[in-house]
Structure formats: structure tokens, C-alpha cells
Regions:
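Carbohydrate-interacting regions of secretory-pathway proteins
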Residues: 1-347
């Protein structure tokens, strides 16, 4: 069972009990994706899906397991429960669990006693699921995990996130090239102009270290991007030449969206790997969210809350510049952008 809303930062409290030994858990920042590796040329309807994300464990088949933190379909146990928290558990009775997820800091409590904590940013938002795994049936009788008094405090995204788009006009932005950028129904719409060439909509302000996020919806096939540390020179024929690092945005499934490409210089900074959870996280024909964090030489990107790449650049060429939305040659149908934010007071 899952909550049909995604949560990033939150506090969740609930009670649970198991009348028979069983494995269950509370999954959070979770995504429903194909099981990896996906066979080459596999069709979506032929793929087998499962959950990817974090889990606060409920495990009563062994003594010390409830309250630990796991990564489902990934690294396994990330933190075991503390001895003090396990002692608070009541066998066959109701137990209280609390989960705090604020940025990369995740804590699990049992009866207000800290059970496990991690600092991890592989998943920064996703769904919440209640899980039961009946791997063994006792005397042909069903086993279950019971949940009650489920309460969640949605904290949104902690921090001073400042909007770069006012939802009304393109104040604070500048158009480079012949492509058309307009505001329609509160979103930025980029479409091919008469030359069907390459164009950019760039912020007037520049950044060095930053964390930014934006939602996009592709209107068709093509190639797009979210650039940072950028500058643009115009050729005599009016064609814009950008110097910057591109966070790729493209409609493939699997997708290369979120991987890093340095235009006109080194190309792919990391060769895209399409056998990762993030490569299957794109939602075709729907809104998606890209996020990028850059501090010094280190850049991290996420697609729909799943980490795509973490890259330490050994020889960066660019250290400051503006953000730019790209409409590349071939993206004739266009792209829409909204909810563009940058985090002030980055730590």
C-alpha cells in the first residue's frame, strides 16, 4: 500500500504490530521501476518492476532487526538498529515508529528511542509504502503486519529556495538565438523559431557554488538541457555558441537525462550508464524534476528524486556562469519549464 503523493522532507509516525514472525517495513522516498539489469530491447510491458528507495525495517523473525535502515533493491542494510531501541519493542503488541527525513539526514526511532540514522542522498524524494513480505506461510495461515495511527508532516523542501521564474513573464531572463520562449499558463514554453536552430533562455544572474531544481515537460522528441556555469557568444549569423556544462534532458527510455556534458569541449564528463535506477525514472509525457548541486569541483544530479551521477571533476574549465534552458536542434515540438528554484545559503 502506498501514499499517492511524493514526499521529500517529512516526519512520519505510526504504530505497528505483528502477531506472527514476519518481515515488513515502511518504505520511503520510494520509486516503482524495472528490476535491473533490463534486457536489451525489452518492451515496458515485458519488464518486471519492484521498489527502489529506503526502508525502515520491521522484522520479527530475528531479535535485532526492527528499526534498521535498508536500501531496497540496492545496497541492502545501511544502518542496524541500536540495542537500546530494540529493547523497547513489545512482542505481539503495538509499537511506535517515527521516521525523520530532512535532506540527506535520515533517522528512525522506536518508542522515541533513536534506532538508526544515516546521511545519504541517493534518494531525495519519492513515495511512502507500507510493506509486508509473507515469504513463509505458517500452517497455511496468512501472516500480516498491522498498521494504525499513521500521521505525516510534510516539510516540503527544507531551506531558503528562491524562485527564478515569477510565473508571469521572463523578467530576469535573456533569450539567445532565434528560438521562441514565451510564458503560457504560468509556465515557460520553448519552441523552434523560423530557423529551427538552437536557442537558449538564460538567467541574467550568475552563480558559482549552487543547488538548483526545475520541473520540465517535453512536448515531443528532441534534445534539451539545463546548463550551468554558462556564457554565450553570438556568431555573425546569429547562432549562439554556449560555453557551459549541460545537465542532459532527453526523452529516451532508458534516458540519459541528468548526465553531464560539456558543450564544445570535453563532451560527456561521465559516460551515461543506462542500467541504473535513474535511467528508468523519466516520466514520458508528464512533468519531471531535475536537480543539480555544484560545490567546487563536485557536481551531483538527480532525476525525479533519484541520484543520476556524482562527479568530481579533475580538471574543470568553468567555475561561474548563468543557468540556461536549451532548445537544441531537433527539438521542434518544444519543452515546458516551471518551478525553477535555487537554494540560497548553500552549505
Amino acid at each position: 500500500m502506498y501514499e499517492k503523493k511524493e514526499f521529500a522532507d517529512f516526519e512520519l509516525e505510526l504504530e505497528f504490530r505483528t502477531l506472527r514472525p514476519i518481515n515488513g517495513g515502511v518504505q520511503f522516498r520510494t520509486h516503482w521501476l524495472p528490476i535491473l539489469p533490463v534486457p536489451e530491447n525489452a518492451k515496458p510491458e515485458d519488464m518486471v518492476y519492484d521498489c527502489y528507495g529506503y526502508q525502515a525495517n520491521i522484522e520479527t523473525r530475528v531479535k535485532k532487526a526492527t528499526g534498521g535502515i535498508m536500501e531496497e533493491n540496492g545496497r541492502g542494510y545501511l544502518a542496524e538498529p541500536s540495542d537500546e531501541s530494540v529493547k523497547t519493542l513489545t512482542q505481539k503488541g503495538w509499537n511506535r515508529m517515527k521516521i525523520e527525513a530532512i535532506g540527506p539526514k535520515i533517522k528512525v526511532y522506536l518508542h522515541d528511542v533513536l534506532s538508526a540514522e544515516i546521511e545519504d542522498d541517493k534518494f531525495i524524494k519519492g513515495y511512502i509504502l507500507l510493506q509486508v513480505r509473507a515469504d513463509e506461510v505458517i500452517k497455511d495461515e496468512p501472516v500480516s503486519v498491522e498498521y494504525r495511527n499513521i500521521r505525516i508532516k510534510d516539510l516540503g523542501r527544507i531551506g531558503n529556495w528562491v524562485s527564478l521564474f515569477n510565473g508571469t513573464n521572463l523578467d530576469g531572463w535573456k533569450n539567445y538565438g532565434s528560438e521562441e520562449w514565451t510564458v503560457e499558463n504560468g509556465v515557460i514554453v520553448g519552441k523552434s523559431g523560423p530557423k529551427k536552430s538552437e536557442g537558449y533562455l538564460a538567467t541574467e544572474k550568475t552563480w558559482k557554488d549552487f543547488r538548483a531544481r526545475a520541473k520540465f515537460k517535453m512536448l515531443g522528441e528532441g534534445n534539451y538541457g539545463f546548463f550551468y556555469h554558462s556564457s554565450i557568444k553570438m556568431r555573425e549569423d546569429g547562432y549562439p555558441i554556449i560555453s557551459g556544462v549541460q545537465v542532459e534532458v532527453e526523452p529516451g527510455y532508458p534516458t540519459k537525462t541528468g548526465w553531464l556534458y560539456e558543450s564544445y569541449k570535453r563532451g560527456w564528463l561521465v559516460e551515461p550508464n543506462t542500467q541504473t535506477p535513474a535511467s528508468w525514472a523519466l516520466r514520458p509525457n508528464d512533468w519531471n524534476e531535475i536537480e543539480v548541486k555544484c560545490i567546487g569541483n563536485k557536481t551531483t544530479t538527480w532525476l525525479n528524486g533519484i541520484k543520476v551521477v556524482e562527479f568530481d571533476d579533475p580538471s574543470p574549465n568553468l567555475f561561474e556562469g548563468f543557468f540556461a534552458l536549451q532548445l537544441h536542434t531537433g527539438g521542434a515540438a518544444g519543452i515546458m519549464w516551471k518551478d525553477i528554484f535555487v537554494l540560497e545559503e548553500l552549505k
